Amino acid sequence: MQIRKLDTTQKSERARFVDFIFDLYKDHPLWVPPFRSEAMKTLDASKHPFYEHSYADFFVVEEGSQVLGRIAMLENRSFNNFHNTKTAFFGYFEVVENIDVARMLLQKAIEWAKAHDLDTLIGPRGVIGIDGSVLVEGFEHRPAMTIPYNYPYYDAFIKDSGFEKDTDYLSGYASGDHELPPRLYDIAAKVKAKRGFSIKTFSSKDEIRQWIPRAMAIHREAMSGLHSFFPPSEAETREVINSLLMIVDPSLIKLVMKDDEIAGFLIAYHDVSAGLQKAGGRLFPFGWFHILRDRRKTDWVNINGLGLLPQYRGLGANAVLYTELRDTIAAHGFKHMDIVQVNETNFNSRSDMETMEIKWYKRHRHYKMIF
């Protein structure tokens, strides 16, 4: 066995990194493949906006012609400049069930970070900054769209190399027909009437685009205190927004307004994981057909953003937000709701959701090592 840095200027080398996960999970009924084109773009410094400010190296462990594992090493300079830190990230970690292969990959990650004069290593996180984590609970459930799935041995393999838990993210389930207490609707009505809260809805993707600058400013305000946050560039913002708009139904995007100011948000989308499985990682020639058909048929919805800005909490606006969520789910006839990756330290959000009888059923993890 040997570990090798890939020459990512070569398409064949990028494909070697990407193809490995399709081989590793090809017989797994719950794994949801990424789009190959998007995965390939992640490695392409000439196409992905991450490389306008930062850099990454990609490694594989090989035995003969066979790939046994892979890992990426990143220095996100935007993150380090924002936090005044010297942090490296590892990402896209995938490995066969062989602890020696995992040790080779993770030791390379440690060596790479030290060689680049960085003193902390966190992962898995990718070039977007919000992508990547390791599933540690809930292996019997298919992941929500864009959320990682992996084999159960990953957690032990990573800890074996000296990493410790950094942060856990919880995903929760609720039945689509769950009823909220009538008093919550009474509170929401009073808050709207007396305190100037309202719901902003969208009728088209173009209308959503017009609101993106305001929404991103609010996003930065709301997230800047989190240790995982960094301000994305305009190009990175476009990258994420364009990916979201490919799949989003505008009627599932809502803003809570306080007079003319954004006070909170609801971001939901149809879970088309089954369609992505049928597409096999390709949009063409028939991938779009499977995805669009599943979007029409699915009775699952993913909630991937739900919250209020700090200054509007405690004013009754949470009643406005959660009743709007319930009404949106009912209007679309969803039977199942997946609340995606809530930071375990976000106690306010967790408490609100537990009041709504959300049951936490999946757990993802980031790991950390300080040198």
Where are these regions (language model features)?
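Catalytic cores of nucleotide-enabled group-transfer and carboxylate-activating enzymes in metabolic
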Residues: 34-37, 43-44, 52-60, 68-70, ...
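A conserved beta-strand-loop-helix scaffold within acyl/acetyltransferase catalytic domains
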Residues: 21-63, 71-81, 207-306
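Conserved acetyl-CoA-binding loop of GNAT-fold acetyltransferases
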Residues: 22, 159-166, 352-363
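Short, well-ordered beta-strand micro-motif
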Residues: 60-62, 171-175, 255-257, 366-370
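Generic start-of-chain signal for non-secretory N-termini
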Residues: 1-30
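Acyl-donor binding region in acyl/amide transferases
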Residues: 80-162, 279-355
